[in-house]
């Protein structure tokens, strides 16, 4: 485990570099475009408006109730799915850096999550506008969203590291994950709330992303997530990190040869 701990500590020591790389990557993607990174916000806004109008009719719900919930769910899903999908090719895309520079491996998954967090921060503008149009009774319970988001980040990091290693060894993993995520989207309470879907609730709660969405979204509307939601997500973090550390410790020396 010394290899894992050493790599992680070195990565944390390079946090300023990680933030700079994530910011530069985001900025470079929209260089010379008229709106720059605001295209991120515009894309999220179009998704919220379009899906909000359609699903409020299909689900026969008031827009004032559905759209705020949909906005948070959609922004979280874009963040989570972005981390999951891109992590399958993280080490492959950073192959030149990995081969030529002696940097810790954890830098690359952390950079991915930081970059996705920057995108999420841009998209929060959409949430602010929605909450102005459809005000919600925000209270002290809403602070639990921050705790929930921290738990989500802890889980996403081990998921990203795990998928980065597997994706470096098996290149087909990227296509498999990309094909599965649209299906998982409809099994995740993004467009609806977990208790409102007209499908088997057991299927929804077998989906780990359901817990991630619930942890962050429910407190914003004054609802404290059930105890089992915290128990399962914390348990996922403990078990997931344990498996990831074992796999990383065993296969990290081979990553440079795989890519």
Curated annotation (Swiss-Prot):
Official protein name in the record: O-antigen export system permease protein RfbD
Main subcellular location of this protein, as a coarse class: membrane
Record keyword Secreted present: no
GO molecular function: ABC-type transporter activity
Domain of life: Bacteria
A single GO cellular-component term on record: plasma membrane
Lineage, broadest ranks: Bacteria, Pseudomonadati, Pseudomonadota, Gammaproteobacteria, Enterobacterales
InterPro entries: ABC2_TM (IPR013525)
Family to which the UniProt record says this protein belongs: Belongs to the ABC-2 integral membrane protein family.
Known function: May form an ATP-driven O-antigen export apparatus, in association with RfbE.
Cystine pairings recorded for this chain: none
Topology of the protein relative to the lipid bilayer: Multi-pass membrane protein
Domain annotation ABC transmembrane type-2: ranges: 35-248
Transmembrane segments: 35-55, 65-85, 112-134, 146-166, 179-199, 202-222, 228-248
Biological process (GO), any one: polysaccharide transport
Keyword annotations from UniProtKB, A to Z: Cell inner membrane, Cell membrane, Membrane, Polysaccharide transport, Sugar transport, Transmembrane, Transmembrane helix, Transport
Location(s), subcellular: Cell inner membrane
Keyword Cell membrane set for record: yes
